[in-house]
UniProtKB/Swiss-Prot annotation:
SUPFAM superfamilies registered for this protein in UniProt: NTF2-like
Name of the protein in question: UPF0225 protein CE1570
HAMAP family: UPF0225
Family listed: Belongs to the UPF0225 family.
Length: 130
C-alpha cells in the first residue's frame, strides 16, 4: 500500500512523507546516516515497501523474501540512542522503539546495527528486547 505523499511521515521527523522518506523509497537518494536509514526502513514497514526493506538489508543477513502482515500498523518511531552511523563512519548502531497496533497492539524495542556497503548504509542485525 503506497503511503500518502502529503501525510506526516511516520518516521517522526515532523516532515511529510514526500519531504522525508519518499526520496529514499523512490531510489532518488540514499540515507546519509544509519539513523536516517532506520527511519526510512521504519516508514517502509508502515508503507509496505518490502522491496526497499530487502534492498537496504545486508546481503549477509537478508532473508530470501519478506512478507509483511497488513493487519499490523506501525505508526510511531522513537529513537532512543545512536552510536556512530554518521556520514564518515563505517558502522553504526540505532536503538529504537517501534509502536504498532492492529493485529497486536504494543511496542517493539530493538538495538540495530548497520554498516556501509559500497558507500551506502545497510541494516545488518537487530537485537529485539524481550
Amino acid at each position: 500500500m503506497p503511503y500518502d505523499y502529503d501525510l506526516r511521515c511516520p518516521c517522526g521527523t515532523g516532515l511529510t512523507y514526500g519531504q522525508c522518506c519518499h526520496r529514499y523509497h523512490a531510489g532518488n537518494h540514499h540515507a546519509p546516516t544509519a539513523e536516517a536509514l532506520m527511519r526510512s526502513r521504519f516508514t517502509a514497514f508502515a508503507a509496505g515497501e518490502t522491496d526497499y526493506l530487502l534492498d537496504t538489508w545486508d546481503p549477509a543477513t537478508r532473508p530470501a523474501e519478506l512478507t509483511l502482515d497488513d493487519r499490523l500498523e506501525f505508526y510511531r518511531l522513537e529513537i532512543l540512542e545512536t552510536e556512530g552511523g554518521g556520514p564518515f563512519d563505517a558502522t553504526g548502531r540505532v536503538k529504537f522503539q517501534a509502536f504498532h497496533r492492529g493485529l497486536a497492539d504494543g511496542v517493539q524495542e530493538e538495538d540495530s546495527t548497520f554498516r556501509k556497503m559500497d558507500g551506502r548504509w545497510v541494516y545488518s542485525l537487530g537485537d529485539v528486547a524481550e
